[in-house]
Amino acid sequence: MTLYLDNAATSFPKPEPVCTAVDHAMRHGAANPGRGGYRLSLEAGRTVLAARTAAARLVGMPDPAQIIFVANATEALNLALFGVLRAGDRVVTTSMEHNAVVRPLRALADQGVEVVKVPADRSGFIPPADVKRACTPGTRLLAMTHCSNVTGTLQAVEELGPWCRAQGILCLVDAAQSAGLFPLDVGAMAIDLLAVPGHKAIMGPPGTGFLCVGSGVQLKPLLYGGTGTRSMSDAQPDELPERLESGTLNVVGLAGLHAALEFLQEIGLNRVREHERALLDQLLAGLRRIPAVHLYGPTATERHGGALSFTLAGFDPAVVGYRLDHEFDIGVRVGLHCAPDAHRTIGTFPQGTVRVSPGWFNSHADIDRFLAAVHALAAG
């Protein structure tokens, strides 16, 4: 049986309640929410509201209307970046960002936005003092990851969010690798815009995610169209969430997302974090005992997310990944992980690394199996 260790890309398997909810919605409740007064449409609307309320609870957002449903964190980040920034604006970002931030900012730079990139250290950590120095007067936005998808490094968002607010700078956080694994509170952390995927540590279906929009933040819509409200007007409505949610929502996926959020609430975020941290401790200890392994990122797991990167001396990471799959039936992610700047930062560009990322459904026996496979490869 395949050992899946690529949960930083998407969690697998999904909890059984998620599968059940998706199946039930597809068979019995996949009407168009907010588009009709008949019972099936109203039931679909209740499904969406339940997911929206649970998502708001996860991130400490008092008003569920400020949760905007999207297909993934990439769409959430595009909505935030293109919604806020205009020609002449200045945005500060970092060298640890995913292409979901890098590429929109490149497109915005071509439109006249000034983009300033703060380098991280070799562990992938971005010193807050360096970010503060880069945020000179006139900076419109800080856009940064909460947790690296390459090194697993957790960034000091809890310090930078309040500092940005005091300076009048908007704070956009990519929580792709932290939501569902670390506590998030947009109020306490002073986060104005938070991008969250539903399919990673939250354990929801693919095609789900949301953008949390803080009070007073005005975004230009990314999409325009039908919202089920104010249909007599050809102008996009001003109210949230309708202003930023044009078109039919993924009610089937949102049924699964709601089930995932309830599952996460039931087992407890701390329990998930402690389980994954124990697996990471085991991974780090085991890989350190293999002389040919070079590890990247934090040396301890206190501020370490679910992704762990390494290289094996004498092997291209792509070969390691291929052999783990074909000889040992183990799935990991290799290469640049859609974050080339992060690999430049840690010195692994252009080959990249082998990334292993355990999840809730992995066990210590799984990690033993993985370590034995890496040891066998290293031994030749």
Task: List where the protein language model places each region.
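Pyridoxal 5′-phosphate
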Residues: M1-G380
